[in-house]
């Protein structure tokens, strides 16, 4: 995988896509998409790209009743050999329970072309309060293709700052069967800002001692830059 070339392509798309998107009527379209460039694809505190940059892209169709389906892709690097990328498929349902509470549930299929033994499903439920606070619960009965039950719990909050910046916090914990792995904690604190269809964030992420013992340098604390364009 040529991470530098992929990231350069993503950054070009970030700069040019808003001009193409301006001709579209976002409000009338059930389709949404995003293209992202990241300095490191970090998932639950652990690098999925061997601490290198990559590009990501997603596409979603949402029905008038809140049912949605789509796909998402990212480069990955787990060492020598396959896979070179992750391709996820998902279907879900999103609904506003009232004026301040939103509920979302989805089934995500993680796939790794060329390394199908890593494929697995995960059920993810997220409740958002007042748009700025959320709680996420996730469960897989075959985490990482290991035939192991795994749970994930995450809480996140965002606080508005001057000039439309946002201060973002997140803390999560992964729970595994004892014979598979120790449980570990991950966290993130960062600043983000949207510029119309383009958004940017800079976050400092890490894990606790258990996470570092399990994943080594891939779980070391680091700064992650994300640039995203989407409609």
Question: Can you say where each PLM-predicted feature lies in the sequence?
Answer:
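Outer-membrane beta-barrel "beta-signal"
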Residues: 159, 189-198, 204-206, 217-231
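Outer-membrane beta-barrel proteins
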Residues: 19-25, 63-66, 94-99, 129-131, ...
């Amino acid at each position: 995988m040529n991470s530098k070339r992929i990231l350069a392509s993503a950054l070009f798309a970030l700069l040019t896509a808003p001009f193409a998107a301006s001709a579209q009527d976002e409000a009338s379209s059930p389709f949404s998409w995003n293209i992202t460039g990241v300095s490191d694809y970090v998932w639950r505190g652990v690098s999925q790209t061997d601490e290198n940059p990559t590009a990501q892209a997603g596409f979603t169709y949402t029905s008038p009743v809140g049912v949605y389906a789509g796909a998402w892709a990212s480069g990955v690097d787990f060492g020598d050999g396959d896979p070179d990328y992750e391709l996820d498929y998902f279907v879900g349902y999103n609904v506003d329970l009232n004026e301040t509470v939103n509920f979302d549930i989805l089934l995500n299929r993680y796939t790794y072309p060329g390394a199908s033994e890593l494929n697995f499903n995960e059920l993810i439920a997220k409740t958002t309060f007042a748009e700025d606070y959320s709680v996420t619960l996730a469960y897989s009965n075959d985490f990482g293709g290991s035939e192991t039950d795994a749970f994930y719990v995450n809480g996140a909050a965002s606080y508005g700052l001057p000039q439309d910046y946002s201060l973002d916090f997140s803390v999560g914990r992964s729970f595994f069967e004892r014979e598979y792995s120790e449980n570990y904690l991950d966290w993130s604190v960062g600043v983000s800002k949207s510029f119309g269809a383009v958004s940017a964030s800079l976050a400092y992420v890490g894990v606790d001692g258990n996470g570092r013992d399990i994943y080594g340098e891939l779980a070391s604390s680091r700064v992650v830059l994300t640039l995203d364009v989407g409609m």
